[in-house]
Amino acid sequence: MACPPELEESLVWKLTDLGLHRHAVQHAPETPDRKQLLLWLPQPEWPEAERQQLLASLEPLAEPFGLPLPQGHWDDVADEDWSLSWKQHWQPDPVGEGLLILPAWLEVPPEHGERLVIRMDPGSAFGTGSHPTTRLCLEALEKAPPVGALVADLGCGSGVLGLAALGLGATAVVAADTDSLAVRATGDNRELNGRPADLLKVSLGSVEALQHLLEGRRADLLLCNILAPVIEALAPGFEALVAPEGRALLSGLLVDQAPRLEQVLGDLGWRVSARGSQGRWGLLEIQRR
């Protein structure tokens, strides 16, 4: 089925939560907003009635965005090695002017040889760079490279943002996530990119976990690609994480959620220094007043 960018994260989360791990979201590099969700199910265990019930269970995920769930269709395919079939649907994904998200098993295409390569294992349910909020953060990092910076990544998911920060000149990254699978995914992707553990430290937890990893220091840059209500709840802890002259990139929010979040951040002593958007998703760059 077609997969609008607004629904990607919710659909992937729901399928994973249901234990349906044989899925992929694909798009052509030149059209990142035109995605397809593919799901493989063993036919004997999933007759048509069961498949229709599954699609119906996904419909509520589209309601908060005022969108209908795109119509899905099923095709019969020959039984094959799932790992090979799954890998066919991942392609090199250029981001911004000079970044390339590359599935770990692929070689760098000659036409992208000058880009900074970030190798990822898309096997987890966490961001590989294709979601609009992740792309917004990656593009913002590229526009203002964190050269010489200590970076903190709150809600690190796959670790793609921290890996990009290191590639763009950060001296070190500390990362945390409340999901143990995300912590594992970040560690795995760190190894794929040949980054030593002391340059990208990752821990289970939230603000307190980052404070522990920072060891009394404060970060020059905070990355936080989480949903707006979670950002709002965590915002009182940002002061303890970010140096007085530092900044934070906040994404994961819808554009229409930005005004409320800006007010909350303003009350906490932050000002918005830049804004970005891609479709209905937004990004805020903030600094201390």
From Swiss-Prot:
Entry GO MF terms: protein-lysine N-methyltransferase activity
GO cellular component: cytoplasm
Main subcellular location: cytoplasm
Binding site for S-adenosyl-L-methionine: 134, 155, 177, 225
Catalytic activity field: L-lysyl-[protein] + 3 S-adenosyl-L-methionine = N(6),N(6),N(6)-trimethyl-L-lysyl-[protein] + 3 S-adenosyl-L-homocysteine + 3 H(+)
Record-listed E.C. numbers: 2.1.1.-
Listed name of the protein: Ribosomal protein L11 methyltransferase
Organism (species): Parasynechococcus marenigrum (strain WH8102)
Gene: prmA
